[in-house]
Amino acid sequence: MTSWRHDSLGASSSEPLPVVIIGNGPSGICLSYLLSGHIPYVKPGAVHPHPLLQRKLAEAPGVSILDQDLEYLSEGLEGRSQSPVALLFDALLRPDTDFGGSIDSVLSWKRQKDRAVPHLVLGRNLPGGAWHSIEGSMVTLSQGQWMSLPDLQVKDWMRKKCRGLRNSRATAGDIAHYYRDYVIKKGLSHNFVSGAVVTAVEWAKSEHGSPEVQASSPLFQVNGYLTTKDHGHQPFSLRARNVVLATGTFDSPAMLGIPGETLPFVHHDLSALEAALRAGTVNPTSDPVLIVGAGLSAADAVLFARHYNIQVIHAFRRSVHDPGLVFNQLPKMLYPEYHKVQQMMRDQSILSPSPYEGYRSLPEHQPLLFKEDHQAVFQDPQGGQQLFGVSMVLVLIGSHPDLSYLPRAGADLVIDPDQPLSPKRNPIDVDPFTHESTHQEGLYALGPLAGDNFVRFVQGGALAAASSLLKKETRKPP
């Protein structure tokens, strides 16, 4: 346990921390790097291939990106994210990656300790967050270079580990190890507290921006507990001037909401299949494993099961020709294994002969009931019912963030308060150039909680938040 952990998680701390970050995945790690005094500058003589951006960068030579107008710099950029600062940071880190190029980043990084902002990063797992919960051999959706954090390329890190990238992509195990290693190599470990579970975040009921209230007491109270080695709970209470939500969306799996979903053979994560294989309760001669879902997690489960010759029934509610199906949006050359799953889904019906032994698909089938005798009941596209015997069920239809530690579980923070929080449809409403909540001063949201779902783009949110937090520290009275 570091001194930070002793001092800052104790109940007797007198001074509030400037920043507490909840979540230690890529967003939290990147923000910690920036708040630790690592400041990005444009390399002298670097020329960006985007003419408009290059002209703007040339207007302020020697001024760090964090100290420039992010709205001005990001204006006119286009790409695969709705976040303007995400597009800006991505363009600076990977200038021509969308065109298949490999131009080096135009950024250089300078350590300026006097600009570091004291902070803590609280996470349930080791640094890397949910990446430590993903089956290690799974190949990442994004290319390896897109998983990199600032100033340490995944490919360079893997080269030192005497590993190479498969199809330009790394395994989930590689990435989890990379993020954990990044925190160590960049000297960030003293800011990170693993095994920390936040149970409540509260803030003063004051008028927006009231300096009198903020001067007399910290705005935020962060309560929770540390999981000890003997699985006990050690409570902690923190006070902070700013809180950053960076917990991602893997906390709570989405449910079908049908009878039998809580039976012991029904699971909602891929690790259950791994455990069943290790225990020998599932094998090539057992009844099929039922996989429900048509996203990438379900595809990963299909690939994992087929690798071990486990029979699979794959059920999903969409048509295989639905343009909204994620497989219909992925380039075949970059993602050959997902294209293979898509091909199997298209070609194989449970009612037709199968050239893929051990795999059957159930397109446009709605699960109705799971029975104690390991029977699964479905409604088919014609309205009839189908019954299948299965060894186990994996329901992989997405997940929801768990913000139960916030007042009203964060319902007042989203874009449409009448609808539930959804990273894709109804994220937390933030200022796009600071990532500060539009509803609560001092509260920030990064990553999927703010609508950014790929590691490649979550770093832009960290840049925006760091810029805002650094400006606050500069303005803070002595």
UniProtKB/Swiss-Prot annotation:
InterPro entries, per database record: FAD/NAD-bd_sf, OKL38_fam
One matching Pfam family: Pyr_redox_3
Keywords attached to this entry: Differentiation, FAD, Flavoprotein, Growth regulation, Monooxygenase, NADP, Oxidoreductase, Phosphoprotein
Listed cofactors: NADPH
Coiled-coil ranges per UniProt: none
Enzyme class of the recorded protein, top EC level: oxidoreductase
EC number from the UniProt entry: 1.14.13.-
Modified residues (Phosphoserine): S12
Database matches in Gene3D superfamilies: FAD/NAD(P)-binding domain (3.50.50.60)
Binding note for cofactor: No monooxygenase catalytic activity in the absence of NADPH.
Compartmental location: Midbody
One Gene Ontology term from the biological process aspect of the record: cell differentiation
Major localisation: other
Gene Ontology MF annotations: growth factor activity
Family that this chain belongs to: Belongs to the OKL38 family.
General function of this protein: Monooxygenase catalytic activity. Involved in regulation of cytokinesis; promotes RHOA activity, probably acting locally at the midbody in late cytokinesis. Monooxygenase activity is involved in stabilizing transient structures between daughter cells, termed intercellular bridges, before abscission. Regulates differentiation and proliferation through the regulation of cell death.
Protein name: Oxidative stress-induced growth inhibitor 1
Organism of derivation: Mus musculus (Mouse)
Gene from which this protein is expressed: Osgin1
